[in-house]
């Protein structure tokens, strides 16, 4: 396809104010040397982080650190934000043409980026499932932070998208015990689909070597302190944005020598930082998606035109989703 045939405009989703989003037209440049034009097939709404952006709740002190790789605008808005996009290279270097790719790009129907920003989706990974690459990457980074060992007892608190991903990867480890813990009994259905034991917080087993906390709640983090064993470690994978969290650190926290360590996907985990790049981590993540068990996280679909309404429904709690997929028009339907 020649540059003359390419549309002069693209359409992207922007957060334009607190709890307000819209689709906006913008110019689409021709790709330069080392760049590719990507036509989007699917994108995914990363509910936790994207709703923080939707609510204009990104703390000013971390606004720069929380920028997405291809974000435009700045927090609180207007801002073009998102990072789960899968598409097809329509124009670019010869060895990239026609390739299905993942990109940490906002919700947009076509975009031009350096090919260094793209990750090839391997054979055996459907494009729709490949949307999960960025979230699997977060889980991979958390496991690299924690370094689970043979025979460990592990709990994952919070059976949402990130917690479920962590449990999915851990289920292949030779652990003595793994529990996925959540207040919502309906999450047992997800645990069953993943082949992981499920527990209500009151019934979760204590004396864990590692607890991954992914519930983004004060109660979940407090429960983590109760479940982790002496001198054990809590890997905090939640982002609380502008919310304050209180913890009972005056009880036995010091006597038991417990540790709470943050894991954030913006940088490769310290244990692998000198030997793995962000690109290596993404390639690891997308290869893991050959396992069809990950389809359990794809819980709904809206069209690109419906994206603003879908975000509002997720915000209002009227749309229950782990990863809500946005489906883009095919080339044929846009002619």
Residue ranges and their predicted role:
Residues 4-8, 276-335:
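C-terminal hydrophobic helical "lid"/dimerization subdomain
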Residues 29-44, 53-105:
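Glycine-rich beta-strand-centered segment in the early N-terminal region that forms part
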Residues 204-211:
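A short acidic, Gly/Pro-enriched loop at the edge of an enzyme's catalytic core
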Residues 147-148, 215, 228-229:
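A generic alpha-to-beta junction signature in SAM-dependent methyltransferases
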Residues 222-287, 328-335:
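Glycine-rich phosphate-binding loop and adjacent beta-alpha segment
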Residues 184-187, 218, 241:
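Helix N-cap at the beta1-alpha1 junction of Rossmann-like dinucleotide-binding domains, i.e.
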Residues 126-201:
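Mid-domain Rossmann-like dinucleotide-binding core that forms the NAD(H)/NADP(H) cofactor-binding site
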Residues 102-115:
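A structural motif shared across PLP-dependent enzymes of the aminotransferase-like
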